Swiss-Prot record:
Transmembrane domains' residue ranges: none
GO cellular component, one term: cytoplasm
MF annotations from Gene Ontology: translation elongation factor activity
Protein name: Elongation factor P
Similarity comment: Belongs to the elongation factor P family.
HAMAP family assigned to the protein according to its UniProt record, in alphabetical order: EF_P
Gene: efp
The protein's annotated pathway: Protein biosynthesis; polypeptide chain elongation
GO BP term, pick one: peptide biosynthetic process
The UniProt record lists the keyword Magnesium: no
InterPro entries: Elong-fact-P_C (IPR015365), NA-bd_OB-fold (IPR012340), Rib_uL2_dom2 (IPR014722), Transl_elong_fac_P/YeiP (IPR020599), Transl_elong_KOW-like (IPR013185), Transl_elong_P/YeiP_cen (IPR001059), Transl_elong_P/YeiP_CS (IPR013852), Transl_elongation_fac_P (IPR011768)
Compartments it resides in: Cytoplasm
Length: 194
């Protein structure tokens, strides 16, 4: 049976069960109105469907933690409709439906270590590292003077994702990208690339 905790102990990225479905807490807010009882507003993402919902709890409620297993695995390959990962401890192959991780797949490349979420013996999602280093394979060339005004341009990365980068970024550059927001963080020297 899953563990229950007081709603006031809720945290971001915590896994909870709501109406028999697994959710990941995206955000929460403790609200104390002038009149009436305090409550907690929780924004959560359904780990099966990817849909986000808002749930309101009384401050006296308790929530059920979802019974997730988290496994470190290395991305091996993708076929027509599944991504395949090799677990680090047991060296078992785990397959996940491409639809279940379509957002994360934008920044996924072979050999990358991720966390695979398993719920009731079924892999249902992954968590990427917070930032990844990827090569720019296609972008318009920068011109002198473009950097003075700031601004950005689209760039296609080696994984196929398209992000906005500063004008001084060129094809072949290695950039660090925040996987949660898809935002450019910095350009790396080739010597810095791991």
């Amino acid at each position: 049976m899953a563990e229950k905790i007081d709603i006031n102990r809720i945290q971001r990225d915590m896994f909870i069960e709501y109406k028999g479905e697994p959710y990941r807490v995206v955000d929460y807010d403790h609200v104390k109105p002038g009149k009436g009882q305090a409550f907690v507003r929780v924004k959560a993402k359904n780990m099966n469907t990817g849909n986000a919902i808002e749930i309101t709890y009384k401050s006296s409620d308790s929530i059920e933690l979802a019974d997730f297993e988290q496994v470190f695995a290395e991305f091996s390959y993708k076929d027509a409709d599944e991504y395949h990962f090799l677990t680090q401890n047991t060296h078992e192959m785990i397959s996940i439906n491409a639809e279940d991780i379509k957002e994360e797949a934008k920044f996924l490349k072979e050999g990358m270590t991720v966390v695979v979420f398993i719920y009731k013996n079924k892999p249902i999602g992954i968590e990427l590292p917070k930032a990844v280093e990827l090569e720019v394979i296609e972008t318009d060339p920068g011109f002198k003077g473009d950097t003075a005004a700031g601004g950005s341009k689209p760039a296609k990365l080696e994984t196929g994702a398209v992000i906005q980068v500063p004008f001084f970024i060129n094809e072949g550059d290695i950039v660090k990208v925040d996987t949660r927001t898809g935002q450019y963080l910095e350009r790396l020297d080739r010597a810095q690339k791991k």
